[in-house]
Amino acid sequence: MMGASTGQGYEIARKSREIVRELISEDISSLGPAEVAIVERIVHSTADPEYARITEFSQGFVDEALRSLRSSGGILTDIEMVRAGISHPSRCYIREPAVRELAEKRDITRAAASMEYAASQGFRGIVVIGNAPTALMKVIELTLEGLMDARAVIGVPVGFVGAAESKEALRGTEIPHMITRGPKGGTPVAVAAANALIALSKDKEV
């Protein structure tokens, strides 16, 4: 549970999770068990109960994400910090020289360029966006055009410029997804959601 590896650590995590459940029980009453587990982990990781009210899942998101993980689908992130926090082999191309060149040539962000690069490399799997709205918009574009095989998208970029809009754009598609409405989100949320799915895919405690 939450990375606990000792008896004391497990007990702390258990008590914390009990507190989280009391705080958000009304807000998650309509969610399925897997969705509840994901939201609980997000709230636990951020110490912010508001995520229970602003986190949304599209129909079939959890099933598609778990199916991808169990069939050796990849995980792609927008920045290295998100990749570093995920407890599963993941890819982030933002530092690739080819991505830098593409971004400069096209006058787009490196985060967006990294999604184009991933698509050109035949990426298939779950896309995890915790910081860059431009990356999320590019994933939507590539997926709808049939150029990227995004099986499921965790779309939780943070910020006041483009974050809410990019999530609403994702919300309006049929791409399996989860989002946090409004400007809130970020690395801790993205990592918590991804690691919860990974645990669920292995039938482990979230």
From Swiss-Prot:
Keyword presence, Isomerase: yes
- What is catalysed by this protein? Co-precorrin-8X = cob(II)yrinate
Q: What GO molecular function terms would the record report?
A: cobalt-precorrin-8 methylmutase activity; precorrin-8X methylmutase activity
Q: What is its EC number?
A: 5.4.99.60
Q: In which pathway does it act?
A: Cofactor biosynthesis; adenosylcobalamin biosynthesis; cob(II)yrinate a,c-diamide from sirohydrochlorin (anaerobic route): step 9/10
Binding site residues for substrate: 16, 41
Q: Which UniProt keywords apply?
A: Cobalamin biosynthesis, Isomerase
Query: Which top EC class is named for this enzyme in its record?
Result: isomerase
One GO-annotated biological process of the protein: cobalamin biosynthetic process
Q: Name one Pfam family in it.
A: CbiC
Q: Which SUPFAM superfamilies match?
A: Precorrin-8X methylmutase CbiC/CobH (SSF63965)
- Annotated active site: 44
Q: Gene3D superfamilies from the entry? A: Cobalamin biosynthesis CobH/CbiC, precorrin-8X methylmutase (3.40.50.10230)
Biological role stated in the UniProt entry: Catalyzes the conversion of cobalt-precorrin-8 to cobyrinate.
Per the similarity annotation, which family is this?
A: Belongs to the CobH/CbiC family.
What does the annotation say about its assembly with partners? Homodimer.
Q: What is this protein's name? A: Cobalt-precorrin-8 methylmutase
Organism, by scientific name, is Methanothermobacter thermautotrophicus (strain ATCC 29096 / DSM 1053 / JCM 10044 / NBRC 100330 / Delta H) (Methanobacterium thermoautotrophicum)
